[in-house]
């Protein structure tokens, strides 16, 4: 079984006294309750949307809520219909991960579960009030299965908390190192830059010398960029918010990224996007990092594309490449600092992309490109 270890669920089932009788009791309610599942899903998300702290997590608007309601109906169907085997619990675990991923605070999830507890108890009474012993069995089974569901949610949120703590500890150690060497590195680079300026004024028409000096200047820029990225990872620079035209931002990023002649680049749908509120410099960095990765993956011959779309108050930009994609072992930690798929990378680019996107109220996700390769999707509020 993937996800939560099997022993956790087996222990939980033994702890609450789960048995065959509970499964029979839930199935006996399923037929009468099924027509009411859409209403219960509506009530569940109405409760969540009624609280601003929970509502802000649902950045996808009506489309996202509509999808979640459909998922909730299937969740209710399986809740009462089973089978309550290892695959069932694994699916529950993945659903819990979705709520963690979208940033829905756990206390709202736990509170909203009361909608199902009271709603299903009411349906059980309507179905079995003439048979008190069966009503008692159904109510007990409902209590057990809903408590197990809450345990799954708690486990997923706990996993996320532990992962966050690990990231904070890594960044803290990393930050101490960067903070101590950043200033020391800037000083010699500044001396080199000053000397480079003086040398350029004295080379005259010597094209060969100028070519080498230009290379030195380029590498100075690379070194300064690495230091800047390192420092940006450990401090929160204030966002200089203003209306940003993403077509200009992405276009500028594309022009600044070097690519071999064998790698084609296509930009699609950018001109139709509305402005977003954000920091143009930081947003440009997002697409510079993603495009540099895409070009690297697609080289020496391949395809890179940026495709834009808009739906439900969000803009989505897919940065795709025809390279080898990302192996499954790396995907889970792809956006963590110091994780890289490049032989000579230091693993900051995607971590910085994630940080900037989230500071703009957006997200970044990885998926496989149809036909092979990688796709990184950046979503931002429009």
From Swiss-Prot:
<feature type="binding site">
    <location>
        <position position="45"/>
    </location>
    <ligand>
        <name>O2</name>
    </ligand>
</feature>
<dbReference type="InterPro" id="IPR009050">
    <property type="entry name" value="Globin-like_sf"/>
</dbReference>
<comment type="subunit">
    <text>Homodimer.</text>
</comment>
<dbReference type="InterPro" id="IPR003661">
    <property type="entry name" value="HisK_dim/P_dom"/>
</dbReference>
<dbReference type="InterPro" id="IPR039379">
    <property type="entry name" value="Protoglobin_sensor_dom"/>
</dbReference>
<keyword id="KW-0067">ATP-binding</keyword>
<dbReference type="GO" id="GO:0019825">
    <property type="term" value="F:oxygen binding"/>
</dbReference>
<dbReference type="GO" id="GO:0000155">
    <property type="term" value="F:phosphorelay sensor kinase activity"/>
</dbReference>
<feature type="domain" description="Histidine kinase">
    <location>
        <begin position="180"/>
        <end position="382"/>
    </location>
</feature>
<keyword id="KW-0597">Phosphoprotein</keyword>
<keyword id="KW-0547">Nucleotide-binding</keyword>
<dbReference type="InterPro" id="IPR004358">
    <property type="entry name" value="Sig_transdc_His_kin-like_C"/>
</dbReference>
<feature type="region of interest" description="Globin sensor">
    <location>
        <begin position="1"/>
        <end position="155"/>
    </location>
</feature>
<dbReference type="InterPro" id="IPR012292">
    <property type="entry name" value="Globin/Proto"/>
</dbReference>
<dbReference type="GO" id="GO:0000160">
    <property type="term" value="P:phosphorelay signal transduction system"/>
</dbReference>
<keyword id="KW-0902">Two-component regulatory system</keyword>
<dbReference type="GO" id="GO:0018106">
    <property type="term" value="P:peptidyl-histidine phosphorylation"/>
</dbReference>
<dbReference type="Pfam" id="PF02518">
    <property type="entry name" value="HATPase_c"/>
</dbReference>
<comment type="function">
    <text>Member of the two-component regulatory system GcHK/Anae109_2439. Autophosphorylates in response to oxygen availability, and then transfers the phosphate group to a conserved Asp residue in the receiver domains of the cognate response regulator Anae109_2439, resulting in its activation.</text>
</comment>
<dbReference type="GO" id="GO:0046872">
    <property type="term" value="F:metal ion binding"/>
</dbReference>
<keyword id="KW-0408">Iron</keyword>
<dbReference type="Pfam" id="PF11563">
    <property type="entry name" value="Protoglobin"/>
</dbReference>
<keyword id="KW-0349">Heme</keyword>
<dbReference type="InterPro" id="IPR044398">
    <property type="entry name" value="Globin-sensor_dom"/>
</dbReference>
<feature type="binding site" description="proximal binding residue">
    <location>
        <position position="99"/>
    </location>
    <ligand>
        <name>heme</name>
    </ligand>
</feature>
<dbReference type="GO" id="GO:0042803">
    <property type="term" value="F:protein homodimerization activity"/>
</dbReference>
<feature type="modified residue" description="Phosphohistidine; by autocatalysis">
    <location>
        <position position="183"/>
    </location>
</feature>
<keyword id="KW-0479">Metal-binding</keyword>
<dbReference type="InterPro" id="IPR005467">
    <property type="entry name" value="His_kinase_dom"/>
</dbReference>
<dbReference type="Pfam" id="PF00512">
    <property type="entry name" value="HisKA"/>
</dbReference>
<dbReference type="InterPro" id="IPR036890">
    <property type="entry name" value="HATPase_C_sf"/>
</dbReference>
<protein>
    <recommendedName>
        <fullName>Globin-coupled histidine kinase</fullName>
        <ecNumber>2.7.13.3</ecNumber>
    </recommendedName>
</protein>
<dbReference type="GO" id="GO:0020037">
    <property type="term" value="F:heme binding"/>
</dbReference>
<dbReference type="InterPro" id="IPR036097">
    <property type="entry name" value="HisK_dim/P_sf"/>
</dbReference>
<dbReference type="GO" id="GO:0005524">
    <property type="term" value="F:ATP binding"/>
</dbReference>
<keyword id="KW-0418">Kinase</keyword>
<keyword id="KW-0808">Transferase</keyword>
């Amino acid at each position: 079984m993937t996800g939560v270890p099997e022993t956790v669920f087996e222990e939980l089932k033994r702890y609450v006294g789960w048995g065959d009788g509970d499964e029979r009791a839930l199935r006996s309610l399923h037929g009468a309750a099924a027509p009411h599942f859409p209403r219960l899903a509506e009530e569940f998300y109405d409760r969540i949307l009624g609280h601003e702290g929970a509502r802000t997590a649902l950045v996808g608007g009506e489309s996202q809520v509509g999808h979640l309601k459909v998922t909730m109906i299937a969740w209710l169907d399986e809740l009462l219909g089973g089978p309550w085997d290892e695959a069932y619990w694994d699916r529950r675990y993945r659903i819990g991960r979705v709520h963690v991923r979208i940033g829905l605070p756990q206390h709202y999830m736990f509170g909203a579960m009361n909608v199902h507890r009271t709603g299903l108890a009411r349906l059980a009474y309507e179905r079995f009030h003439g048979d008190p012993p069966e009503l008692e069995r159904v109510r007990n089974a409902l209590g057990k299965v809903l408590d197990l569901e809450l345990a799954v949610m708690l486990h997923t949120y706990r996993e996320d908390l532990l992962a966050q703590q690990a990231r904070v500890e890594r960044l803290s150690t990393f930050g101490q190192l960067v903070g101590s060497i950043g200033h020391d590195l800037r000083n010699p680079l500044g001396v080199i830059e000053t000397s480079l300026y003086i040398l350029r004024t004295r080379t005259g028409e010597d094209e060969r010398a100028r070519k080498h000096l230009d290379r030195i200047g380029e590498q100075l820029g690379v070194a300064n960029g690495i230091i800047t990225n390192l420092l940006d990872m450990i401090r929160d620079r204030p966002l200089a918010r203003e209306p940003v035209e993403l077509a200009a931002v992405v276009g500028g990023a594309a022009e600044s990224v070097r690519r071999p002649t064998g790698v084609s680049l296509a930009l699609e749908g950018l001109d139709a996007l509305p402005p977003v509120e954000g920091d143009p410099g930081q947003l440009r960095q997002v697409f510079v990092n993603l495009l540099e990765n895409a070009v690297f993956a697609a080289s020496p011959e391949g395809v890179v594309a940026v495709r834009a779309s808009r739906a439900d108050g969000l803009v989505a930009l897919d940065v795709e490449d025809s390279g080898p994609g990302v192996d499954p072992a790396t995907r889970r930690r792809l956006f963590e600092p110091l994780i890289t798929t490049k032989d000579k990378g230091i693993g900051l680019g995607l971590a910085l992309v994630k940080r900037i996107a989230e500071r703009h109220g957006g997200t970044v996700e990885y998926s496989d490109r149809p036909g092979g390769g990688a796709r990184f999707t950046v979503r931002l509020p429009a």
